Design a protein with these regions (language model features):
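Short C-terminal beta-strands that terminate individual repeats in beta-propeller domains
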Residues: 9-15, 54-61, 101-107, 143-149, ...
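Canonical WD40 repeat/beta-propeller blade segments in eukaryotic WD-repeat proteins
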Residues: 17-25, 63-71, 104-117, 152-161, ...
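Conserved loop/turn motif of beta-propeller repeat scaffolds
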Residues: 29-30, 73-75, 121, 163-165, ...
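Hydrophobic beta-strand positions that form the internal "hydrophobic ladder"
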Residues: 33, 76-77, 124, 168, ...
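Conserved strand-to-loop turn within each blade of WD40 beta-propeller repeats
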Residues: 36-39, 79-83, 126-130, 170-174, ...
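WD40-repeat beta-propellers
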Residues: 42-46, 85-91, 133-137, 157, ...
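Conserved blade-ending motifs and adjacent loop-strand segments that build the rim/top face
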Residues: 291-321, 350-375
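Blade-level signature of beta-propeller repeat domains, shared across WD40, Kelch, NHL, RCC1
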Residues: 370-395
């Protein structure tokens, strides 16, 4: 595989001194990409038209950063500024953005970092710097439930891509990922700690016989410069491609997170846990990657990519996601503060993944803040600290 640079996109509404900070992971369509800037500009690009960009300014007078955004459908766009999530009507976008506002969702105690809508378009989830996640009922705009469990900023929230499911997962700077059942309870169903998750490589190398020994080994490894960066979780994503016989239902159980220590972890959110974690629901069919791959024996909690900090990211990994048009779901793209975009095959020889090379890479001139995909255009969309949207093809 190779990464090929495509023609970048730039909107006149974005100033030279501005920077892209977030992309909509749930796109308006498979040929579009929506990005947000640090000065409150939201730009929607149709990648089929080289010069076609539609931009509008949100709360332009206050120039507040748009931290996260996602589409509910082709008309409704949610974006987060400060502690408020705003729903916009794309059919009424104006220069100031005010005419497009449908409603506002409040209740967050601090800056909202991530938003997502469930597969049924019935719930909105927003996570914030205070360590909370708020789930809203989109039928009436009311708060459905507040989820508490993290000790640090919650950096990302994502619903499982399964109709009828009320489960979501979150990532945080406390180095933990949590699984929640929004309609059932306000406490997490399952928790993973990136500092002591047992990976496929740990068992393959015979380094670990118990969790206590693993934790001791992690401390001993602190001699490397990379150990000074704890594995804070900066992103979390589920596979968003179409379900097929090649990937269902197992792939719907797998999540990926980018870590502050430069690694990328892939884990099964239905994993029962090595030491007394919540058991997976009885009767769930095990198949495909999640059960037939590295998680099959029930011991391994994750596949850790680029854990040595040399052949992967050499600084914090800031974002990671599954390539949606790859029907087997085994390809992941990650970006980092080291200005590199990496492509991984997490399934191929998963037990050796932490020691293996990325299958493709490209180095940029700026830190990468976020990435998303235009699935129908087969484009990887990258937001860095510039005002220009970078595009790449995976050949």
């Amino acid at each position: 595989m190779t990464l090929e640079s495509l023609e970048p996109r730039r909107a006149p509404a974005v100033a030279d001194t501005d920077a892209l900070v977030a992309l909509a992971h749930r796109a308006r369509s498979g040929n579009e990409c929506t990005c947000a800037t640090g000065r409150g500009t939201i730009v929607n690009f149709d990648l089929r038209e080289p010069n076609d960009a539609r931009a509008f300014v949100v709360r332009g007078a206050r120039r507040r950063e748009v931290n996260a955004l996602t589409w509910r459908n082709e008309h409704a766009l949610f974006h987060a500024s400060d502690a408020v999530v705003v729903e916009l009507d794309a059919r009424k976008m104006s220069a100031a953005g005010d005419a497009a506002v449908i409603r506002r969702f409040e209740g967050a105690r601090d800056v909202v970092n991530g938003v997502d809508v469930d597969q049924d378009d019935a719930m909105l989830a927003a996570c914030d710097d205070a360590g909370e996640v708020i789930a809203y009922d989109l039928s009436n705009g009311e708060i459905l439930r507040k989820l508490r469990g993290h000790d640090g900023c919650v950096t990302a929230v994502a619903f499982r891509r399964k109709r009828g499911a009320s489960e979501c997962a979150t990532a945080s700077t406390d180095c933990r990922a949590m699984k929640w059942d929004v309609k059932a309870k306000s406490v997490p169903v399952r928790t993973w700690d990136a500092r002591n998750m047992l990976s496929a490589e740990d068992y393959d190398c015979g380094k670990v016989t118990a969790r206590a020994e693993y934790e001791s080994a992690s401390i001993d490894a602190g001699a490397s410069a990379k150990a000074f960066n704890p594995p804070m979780l900066h992103s979390l994503a589920f596979y968003r491609g179409e379900t097929s016989e090649e990937n269902a239902p197992g792939l719907r159980r797998v999540a990926v997170s980018a870590c502050g220590d430069g690694s990328v972890i892939v884990f099964d959110i239905d994993h029962p846990g090595v030491s007394g974690g919540s058991r997976a629901s009885k009767g769930k069919k095990k198949s495909s990657l999640a059960s037939a791959g590295p998680f099959a024996d029930g011991r391994v909690e994750c596949v850790r990519l680029g854990a040595d900090g040399v052949r992967g990211h050499t600084n914090a990994a800031t974002c990671a996601d599954f390539v949606p048009w790859n029907r087997t779901g085994d390809v992941i793209v990650s970006g980092g503060a080291d200005r590199r975009l990496l492509v991984w095959n997490w399934v191929d020889e998963a037990s050796h993944a932490a020691r293996g090379l990325p299958v493709a890479s490209i180095e940029r001139d700026r830190k990468i803040n976020d990435l998303a995909f235009a699935a129908d255009s087969r484009a990887i969309c990258v937001a860095d600290t510039s005002p220009t949207l970078k595009l790449f093809a995976l050949r």
